[in-house]
From Swiss-Prot:
Homodimer. Interacts with GRIA1 and GRIA2. This is Synapse differentiation-inducing gene protein 1. Residues 203-228, 250-258 are extracellular. May regulate AMPA receptor content at nascent synapses, and have a role in postsynaptic development and maturation. It is found in: Cell membrane; Early endosome membrane; Postsynaptic density membrane; Synapse. It comes from Homo sapiens (Human).
Length: 258
């Protein structure tokens, strides 16, 4: 009877080992590691929760016949939680002695590299061609600034617009042909001081001839002279008329008293 039970247990172990050989992701030698407390599962991940290896595969009569201590079942869930409660996952822990020995061994093979930047002048220094620097204090640094108010800008725009309008009017006046002032000269000749009126009439006629020839300079000169003589003739004529009227009134007033 004992021989039959041992053969069955050997068949179970051989089937489990054959299944491990076909799976390359797990231990191909043995799916169970025998420890002091009994058979322990080698599946570390929780996806193998259904695989619980223990003494259940062997009949209870085998345990009683071998007089071995009671074997415990291993629950992967409790094992994973107990490890995560003390350590963080995905962290490899080493003792201080191992780390100290590694540090002593690596220190001899390490070399330190130092990067030095090029010398450049600071904001308060000035570089000369020979490579020397001169420090400048805050008093030596002068910043030229230009500021103006918005009101001044508006006034400047108004002045600029007025100047542009004046220049445009002057340009238009220069482009216009000179006037002959013929009507004013005729009035001064007939109604005012007639000698100056005749001269103004003659100059207005010369202005028309110069404009017809295209000589604008001569036409403008004749036009200015005709205007001056016509105004002077009107002024003198007006004075003569006023004087004659005053003399006549004075003469009549004397006759009335007599």
């Amino acid at each position: 009877m004992d021989g039959i039970i041992e053969q069955k247990s050997m068949l179970v172990h051989s089937k489990i080992s054959d299944a491990g050989k076909r799976n390359g992701l797990i231990n191909t030698r043995n799916l169970m590691a025998e420890s002091r407390d009994g058979l322990v599962s080698v599946y570390p991940a929780p996806q193998y929760q259904s695989h619980r290896v223990g003494a259940s595969t062997v009949p209870a009569s085998l345990d009683s016949s071998r007089s071995e201590p009671m074997q415990q079942l291993l629950d992967p869930n409790t094992l994973q939680q107990s490890v995560e409660s003390r350590y963080r996952p995905n962290i490899i822990l080493y003792s201080e002695g191992v780390l100290r020995s590694w540090g002593d061994g690596v220190a001899a093979d390490c070399c330190e590299t130092t990067f030095i930047e090029d010398r450049s002048p600071t904001k308060d220094s000035l570089e000369y061609p020979d490579g020397k620097f001169i420090d400048l204090s805050a008093d030596d640094i002068k910043i030229h600034t230009l500021s103006y108010d918005v009101e001044e800008e508006e006034e400047f725009q108004e002045l600029e617009s007025d100047y542009s309008s004046d220049t445009e009017s002057e340009d238009n006046f220069l482009m216009m042909p000179p006037r002959d002032h013929l009507g004013l000269s005729v009035f001064s000749m007939l109604c005012c001081f007639w000698p100056l009126g005749i001269a103004a009439f003659y100059l207005s006629h010369e202005t028309n001839k110069a404009v017809a020839k295209g000589d604008l300079h001569q036409a403008s000169t004749s036009s200015r002279r005709a205007l001056f003589l016509a105004v002077l003739s009107i002024t003198i004529g007006t004075g003569v008329y006023v004087g004659v009227a005053v003399a006549l009134i004075a003469y009549l007033s004397k006759n009335n008293h007599l």
